[in-house]
Amino acid sequence: MMKSRFCPSPTGLMHLGNARTALFNYLFAKSKDGIFLLRIEDTDVERSKETFDLGLKEDLRWLNLEWQEGPGADEGNGPYHQSKRQAIYDDYYQRLEEADQAYPCFCSEEQLRLSRKIQRSAGKPPRYAGTCRSLSAAEIEKKKAEGLQPALRFRVPDDEVVVFADLVRGEQRFQTNDIGDFIIRRANGTSPFMFCNAIDDALMGVSHVLRGEDHLTNTPRQLLILQALELPVPTYAHIALIVGPDGSPLSKRHGSRGIKELRDNGYLPLALTNYLARLGHYYASDELLSLAELAKGFNVESLSKSPAKFNAQQLDYWQKQTVNQLPNDDFWEWAGSELQSQIPTDKADLFLTTVKPNASFPRDVAYWVNVCFGKTLNLETAQSELLRATGNRYFEEAFEAFKKFGKDLNSVVSHLKEKLNLKGKPLYQPLRIALTGAEHGPELAKLILIMDYETIQNRLQEACQ
């Protein structure tokens, strides 16, 4: 059975890049009637925190990316926290050492740094020089007796080529002479990502590894490990990373925010999944799609090799589409029941049909609740200056027109046009700003029907001051 996986490290909050990787793996699994697995890679003991672990799971559930295997689900291949799997890794270290495919390395960080510096100055790529590769058993025991704690290095075969087919990038070839022997166990006994990640994928039956292109150079090393241990090898696919509009790595200065922050600001999960699913993946449909529909249209061959540029406006577009299709009860649950309670029952339906198409966030709903039912508007300086420049006569005539025609906006506007000889923006804009405090928004005629007549009068009088 096809099985994909998402393997976050609980060293921080989930960001858009993490979320997209999780989403693609989820959609990939669902498109093949496969299994989506969650594994927590918490081998970085100092930086891994339980709060981040819980936060990652909460974010995944909020995005409706439910895993079928992993913590709290099917745990048949567990444990699913790497910090609890050290005995498993130790067993495979022993196998590699016994087969002479791994050896202890006593080189200090300073020695390694100097070696890399010499290699770079000679125009060579930095790789391990093999200082400890041929130590005899006696030399190894002597160094251990001196109290030196060795790391463990994988013995990379010379003069070979590692070849694999990447589902996104096609055939990939790596010369083993360019790789060099690499560390698979640190001197303190802990396991680095590269080793335990490969072991766990094999033991947990992961058939497809879909991850960021920043892991591409890890793949030949992991293939060498798996082949040496005669473990099953998954199929790999390396997706392009998300970058800012300027092509630089995505950061907060581009408007990128963590999933928790987006959720707290009122973004909806379906908006996020519709945006992220199209960020580096082509969909023929430009309509809002359910997760099931996104999965049905997902194809690894439709993943782009080029970096995916983050666009905050596109994210907000999908947010607006999602809000617009919310059932009324869900809309109020999202916007807040305290806002709903401020709306008279007899005006609730009209308010909803008027405001909903113009709302992207709960703060938008709160704004229009205040416009329709609040006492005062907080005008910006430029708006106040525009009202002053319009002159009192405009608002006096508007006041009289509302008295004469009631809430018939067309008649009010015709009256102003006739009395003041105005047209276009000078005719409409001052009235909209005086009544709503905004230059754009829902249809003014409908907003006027929602407002109390007294509110309309008061705002026109305030505009005259």
Swiss-Prot record:
GO terms for molecular function: ATP binding; glutamate-tRNA ligase activity; tRNA binding; zinc ion binding. InterPro entries: aa-tRNA-synth_I_cd-bd, aa-tRNA-synth_I_codon-bd_sub2, aa-tRNA-synth_I_CS, aa_tRNA-synth_I_cd-bd_sf, Glu-tRNA-ligase_bac/mito, Glu/Gln-tRNA-synth, Glu/Gln-tRNA-synth_Ib_cat-dom, GluQ/Sye. Belongs to the class-I aminoacyl-tRNA synthetase family. Glutamate--tRNA ligase type 1 subfamily. PANTHER family: GLUTAMATE--TRNA LIGASE, GLUTAMATE--TRNA LIGASE, MITOCHONDRIAL-RELATED. Its EC number is 6.1.1.17. Signal peptide: none annotated. It is found in: Cytoplasm. ATP binds at K252. It catalyses: tRNA(Glu) + L-glutamate + ATP = L-glutamyl-tRNA(Glu) + AMP + diphosphate. A motif ('KMSKS' region) lies at residues 249-253. GO terms for cellular component: cytosol. Catalyzes the attachment of glutamate to tRNA(Glu) in a two-step reaction: glutamate is first activated by ATP to form Glu-AMP and then transferred to the acceptor end of tRNA(Glu). SUPFAM superfamilies: An anticodon-binding domain of class I aminoacyl-tRNA synthetases, Nucleotidylyl transferase. One of its GO terms (biological process) is glutamyl-tRNA aminoacylation. A motif ('HIGH' region) lies at residues 8-18. It comes from Coxiella burnetii (strain Dugway 5J108-111). Keywords: Aminoacyl-tRNA synthetase, ATP-binding, Cytoplasm, Ligase, Nucleotide-binding, Protein biosynthesis. Its main location: cytoplasm. The gene is gltX1. This is Glutamate--tRNA ligase 1. Monomer.
